[in-house]
């Protein structure tokens, strides 16, 4: 994997930095593991915008990822590593001994031809998936389930990981990359090691058009709007907001806590916020 600074042949390419991985598969993805993906452009079923700054972008198929890793005791060989336009991490196509193929999140250090395993008897090696009760304390893990059998939901982005801190009864404590310490049931599964493609954060988009290819539309500042459109809008000429920063709906931003899920608050041992 190499970091390439593009030659400044145009203003849009002057600041562009690419991450090139020559180990990725250059052909088409595995057709049996593709699904259609319609662009919603940030609209709900009424056609109203519910998520701003989304729309356009290149069409692409969804790669069906195996987040459960439930084929216990069946060895799987990594056939190839692939690029996935739907996520920051790369994916790996694995071939199980019974002939089935599945996509998984590609862990750091996993290479083509390597053998992976799932289940409570799997060795503690990068890329293997085990229940948390069978993972030694202090192990670096990723792709962590929040409920047993639901599939991995935490630590799935490129370069991320978590650490298993302790086990108490039927729960274990996991420290996430954000600093949050969370309780997870010991029957939940996790994968050993870190997520690969850790250089993803070093890339530079270089130009606005590259974000448009990804389906990201422009973000307009509130102070540049009219008063009807944003609490910061209006004024004669260039003016400051005149108040503490808020969202278009008046909710304070920059540190204001918006978490309202009281049902799972007991699962958070230490919040990611320092105070």
Swiss-Prot record:
Signal sequence segment: none
SUPFAM superfamilies reported in the protein's UniProt record: Nucleic acid-binding proteins (SSF50249), Translation proteins SH3-like domain (SSF50104)
InterPro entries documented for this protein: NA-bd_OB-fold, Rib_uL2_dom2, Ribosomal_uL2, Ribosomal_uL2_bac/org-type, Ribosomal_uL2_C, Ribosomal_uL2_CS, Ribosomal_uL2_dom3, Ribosomal_uL2_RNA-bd_dom
Pfam families: Ribosomal_L2 (PF00181), Ribosomal_L2_C (PF03947)
Region of interest called Disordered, as start-end residue ranges on this chain: 38-59, 224-257
Record keywords: Ribonucleoprotein, Ribosomal protein, RNA-binding, rRNA-binding
UniProt keyword Transport, yes or no: no
Domain of life, source organism: Bacteria
Function noted in UniProt: One of the primary rRNA binding proteins. Required for association of the 30S and 50S subunits to form the 70S ribosome, for tRNA binding and peptide bond formation. It has been suggested to have peptidyltransferase activity; this is somewhat controversial. Makes several contacts with the 16S rRNA in the 70S ribosome.
HAMAP family: Ribosomal_uL2_B
Complex and partners: Part of the 50S ribosomal subunit. Forms a bridge to the 30S subunit in the 70S ribosome.
Similarity comment text for this entry: Belongs to the universal ribosomal protein uL2 family.
Record's protein name: Large ribosomal subunit protein uL2
Organism: Burkholderia thailandensis (strain ATCC 700388 / DSM 13276 / CCUG 48851 / CIP 106301 / E264)
Lineage, opening ranks: Bacteria, Pseudomonadati, Pseudomonadota, Betaproteobacteria, Burkholderiales
Primary gene name: rplB
